[in-house]
Curated annotation (Swiss-Prot):
Subcellular location: Cytoplasm
CDD domains named among the record's database cross-references: RNAP_A
Xref: Gene3D superfamilies: 1.10.150.390
Family matches, as InterPro entries: DNA-dir_RpoC_beta_prime, RNA_pol_Rpb1_5, RPO1C
Designated name of the protein: DNA-directed RNA polymerase subunit Rpo1C
GO molecular function: DNA binding; DNA-directed RNA polymerase activity
Family per similarity comment: Belongs to the RNA polymerase beta' chain family.
One of the GO biological process terms: DNA-templated transcription
SUPFAM superfamilies, per the entry: beta and beta-prime subunits of DNA dependent RNA-polymerase
Length: 393
């Protein structure tokens, strides 16, 4: 272990590193048995690498990012459903998932959440199951059998006592919920519940059965199923829940859930509950995970960060398409080059819009050098004064 001396601190604080990297340098030095000279060398080497990774002025980062994501994207599978390491849970992966993310779809094809538990519930299976039953929607067919008695015009429900105990719900509670939801008079005897239409009607009897099947007696309506798995983590093993369906805000309020680690693959739900910065992080993580699962994890994360920055720059989530970023550009020619060309040109002509030719696309269209790289550097010719202080008159 190395103690941080004044010399080391002066060197680290004198670098151009951001605070996060400085903290990591201190942590790395403290964790190693090194001399002051070696510690200074480490700090200087980190700064050198950091400066090397910075973008050159006028570098076309957008074009590079598009190519760096798009080219590996040609190797992605078209399979919509794929087991993403979780038994029995289908998750959209590959190209369809990447398209979902950049299109900023309101609802993913396969919404899901990864729910982490607090210390009290994470290591105890019974405690973890308590959280499962508070999340997974419990409907009547999970609690017992439903039958119809046409002669007496009654719907009969025979509840399973073991299931009621397991899911921690009483027969009385089930009867009350049925009465409130369907507006019928319910008779409950032990684990048997009976009710029927106010007026004898076979159609109404069948309708009551259909309505009964839709009632959620416990849990969150949007979450149809929860899978519980024991997984290895940094400090041992813990139970983690994977859900089919998502209701991010509701899950964060449930007792036993670790809200600081729980994630959701619906970026709009994250935005509504945690704000735009959390949504940006989710876009980056989901995109990176999608690429890694296809064996394309060597794509530099900064390209994905740029995409996420553009999508969230206005404080909301915008898609990359004609209804989002591409359709809202200031340049008429850039908008027209993307989609619905005639409509954009016609609207611009009607409103007398002017294109300042500031971007890449519009300059390519009119055959002018783009204002990036050497295209945005002006060379001024002139002689120097005799003392070298400036340009001669």
């Amino acid at each position: 272990m190395t103690e941080i001396t004044n010399a080391i601190e002066r060197t680290v604080e004198g670098t151009d590193l951001p605070k996060r990297l400085k903290d990591e340098v201190y942590e790395s030095i403290e964790g190693r048995d090194v001399t002051d000279e070696q510690a200074v060398s480490i700090a200087e080497a980190v700064e050198s690498r950091y400066l090397d990774t910075r973008v050159e002025p006028l570098d076309p980062v957008g074009t590079v990012s598009a190519q760096s994501i798009g080219e590996p994207g040609t190797q992605m599978t078209m399979n919509t459903f794929h087991y993403a390491g979780v038994a029995e849970i289908d998750v959209t992966q590959g190209l369809p998932r990447l398209i979902e993310l950049v299109d900023a779809r309101k609802t993913p094809d396969t919404p899901m959440m990864t729910v982490y538990l607090d210390d009290q519930h994470a290591e105890n299976r019974e405690k973890a199951h308590e959280v499962v039953w508070n999340i997974e929607s419990t409907r009547i067919l999970a609690l017992g059998d439903v039958s119809t008695n046409v002669a007496d015009m009654l719907v009969q429900v025979n509840l399973n006592e073991q299931t009621l105990d397991e899911r921690m719900i009483s027969a009385e509670t089930v009867a009350e919920i049925i009465e409130d939801s369907l507006g019928v008079e319910v008779t409950q005897t032990g684990t048997t519940i009976e009710f029927g239409p106010a007026e004898p009607s076979y159609r109404r009897l069948l309708q009551l059965v259909e309505e009964l099947r839709e009632i959620v007696f416990k849990g969150i309506e949007e979450v149809s199923r929860v899978v519980i798995r024991k997984e290895d983590v940094d400090d041992g093993e813990e139970f983690i829940l994977y859900t089919e369906g998502s209701a991010f805000g509701d899950v964060l309020d449930i007792e036993g859930v670790d809200a600081s680690r729980t994630t959701c693959n619906n970026i709009h739900e994250v935005y509504r509950n945690l704000g735009v910065e959390a949504a940006r992080e989710t876009i980056i993580d989901e995109t990176m995970n999608t690429l890694e699962e296809q064996g394309l994890g060597d794509v530099n994360i900064r390209h994905l960060m740029l995409v996420a920055d553009i999508m969230t720059a206005e404080g909301t989530i915008e898609s990359i398409g004609r209804h989002g970023i591409s359709g809202n550009k200031n340049s008429v020619l850039a908008r027209a080059a993307f989609e619905v060309t005639v409509n954009h040109l016609l609207d611009a002509a009607v409103h007398g819009e002017v294109d300042d030719l500031d971007g890449v696309t519009e300059n390519v269209i009119v055959g002018k050098p783009i204002k990036l790289g050497t295209g945005d550097v002006n060379l001024r010719m002139g002689g120097a004064t005799t003392d070298g202080s400036g340009r001669a008159d």
